[in-house]
Amino acid sequence: MGSPVGLTSQEVTTRQLQGLVNNLDTKTSRSLAHILRTNVFTRFNAILGALFIAIVLTGSLADGLFGLVLVANTVLGTAQEWKAKRTLDRIRLLHSPTSHVIRDGVNQLIASHEIVQDDVVVISAGDHIAVDGVVLSSENLEVNESNLTGEADAVMKLSEQRVFSGTFVTAGSGTIHATAVGKESYAQRITAEAKKFTRPVSEIQDVVNRLLAWMLWSFLLLAPLQVWTQLRVDGDRNWQEATVRSVAGLVGIIPEGLVVLTTITFLTAAVALSRQQVLVQQLPAVETLARVSVLCVDKTGTLTTGIMQCDPLLVLNSYDETELQDVLGALADDLAANATLQAIGQKFPSTQAMHVIAHIPFDSLKKWKAIQVDSGSWYLGAPEILSSTDVSVLRKVQDLAHTGARVLLLAHSPTPLTQNALPSQLEPAALIAIKEQVRQDAALTIKYFCDQGVDIYVLSGDHPSTVAAVARAVGIKEDHVRGRVTPEEKRDFIEQLHTRGEVIAMTGDGVNDVLALKKADIGIAMDNAAPATKAVAEMILLDGKFSHLPTAITEGRRVIGNLERVAHIFLAKNVMSVFSIISVAVLSQPFPFLPRQMTLMSTLAIGIPAFFLAIGKSARRYSPGFLSRVLQFSFPAGVAIGCAVVVVDISAPDDSGTAASITALVAFMWIVSVFARPFTARNAVVLATLIILAICAFSIEMLTEFFSFSVTTHNIALGMAGSFCTAGVIEVIHRIQH
């Protein structure tokens, strides 16, 4: 164990070489191996790989074109995710948690992951404890262990008692001896459970996972039927043809690219927000913010700049102002001073004239701190706590609070300090008014949320009149203001809103906001927030600007809107394939397409346009019912396309699949045009390019031979007739739904 001066540089180096470093597993980033594993070794890739092998065995390599698309999707998804990961990791590194340690007798600020075993770590109110350890010294040290025990009440920590990583300091200060770091720490050993506690719920990911499960079950149930049907129709003459036709139908059920597009969409949103100084710590948070119905904000640092200015003292009961200034300087002379105490310290610098015998640190629950000097004990805190019965003092407090000032009372007692208890003899000595500047962008940001139908509540530990004055200045209704709320009351208020079915975002910067941030659907911290606050937040505003939230909501809406559009297309294709497989089984017909033709349709009418739709702009307001809207459109649209394809194929003079391919291509491009509205220049260019490529596939001899198209007047007319009828049905379905 290190000496009181901490480890030496040589001892630190020795432990680093031994691997006794606090390297932590991040919950927001995946390794390259993990990215490769999740993009390559998937159930759908395994199925497509097996189908590709079946095609290779038939010798019809051209029909294995979907294998190249599979590789392209995998490479694209891996490359995009790796690029986004590196971008986000660089930003996270710049804003990674820090800790104070004593090394070579000097208090040093280092990244928390650089702590080594046996380091002496200095902790104070608001700090997130990064390692397991034993308390060496305690100055009224209180730790919240709710992450580990579920108990919200802070625990007083004395010398020789243990503290654990993942907890945070609510009051006081102290030093600890790091006994377990990195994977050996308690919090890291229960990481899986800890992650469950804070991960945001993603409706999008839930819906996509359900769609993928539906498609997988469709494949497993219909694969035997498809193979049996095609062997029954063509097997006697040509098992290779039966295999190829079987694969064509089954490939259509597989949602090539849907998982990749979902991941890319979330990542591009996170990268875009990082450029706007918003760090996304959990990807689903982007979507969650767009679904928010209630926004709860803290006053200080969110509605105000957090920069405080202390007004001259309002002396009470004939106390000597010079002595009061010395007392305030001594009270503010605290390494763990919060913004309020720092403002007091700047106004009344410590002169060292006071001999401090004992002190009690500030606690957001009791709302006061105290020191004992030769002249008695001095208490600084909330007026209604320190002087709850003095009507004249409370009236002065009310008058000052109505101006928007934060008001503190300095009170004196001749008796010595009693730990965490107020004396019976306590006389008001002075009122201190501290003013904060309201953010210039706060009113516009609040108006934006109100226009979007989001209810806004202010939850603050300040005097209700102070909070109400600031709320009025930015346009928040007074009945939505809650003052003098404790951390537990903030948490309980969030829980109460949840019982009404609200989706809640909570912003905060203090350790008193941690419990509420964890209960909210999405917690948002300012960059100057306490380490514990940033540790539990899903988003961090890196420059502390509240005005970035509308941008984040726009990105969330883009994610939801774009993935909904993409899901419509993929599910319609799945339904078409399922309907076609069942229909040809009933009618004892060969499947209408070859695998290469399905690949052409999937690429030009689904894969490429879906990619551009997934990264495009979309500012539509969120409304519940993602899955129901997708099903209400995609199911009838897919059935309509499948019906048209089967009818057209049976009516065609040959079994080349040309007419069916034209029908399906045009129909799916019509779906793309429906969800690309209103057209932007980019969408118009993309759609026009895809149409030209489709025309080339049916008009250039080399391509028609490759795709086995029989381009005759009859096939073209039949295909166009089927596609026009289907496009009309799709348009009607879309208009009815909207």
Regions found by a protein language model. Name each.
Residues 4-6, 16-27, 31, 74-76, ...:
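Actuator/coupling domain of P-type ATPases
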Residues 20-22, 37-63, 67-77, 96-97, ...:
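Alpha-helical transmembrane segments of multi-pass membrane proteins
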Residues 60-96, 103, 198-294, 449-452, ...:
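Hydrophobic alpha-helical transmembrane segments
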Residues 65, 96-209, 409, 514:
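Cytosolic catalytic regions of P-type ion-transporting ATPases
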Residues 76, 106, 179-182, 195, ...:
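Conserved beta-strand/loop elements of the cytosolic catalytic core of P-type E1-E2 ATPases, chiefly
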Residues 226, 479-505, 510, 520, ...:
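Membrane-embedded transport module
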Residues 291-427, 434, 447-448, 463-468, ...:
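Cytosolic catalytic regions of ATP/NTP-dependent phosphoryl-transfer enzymes
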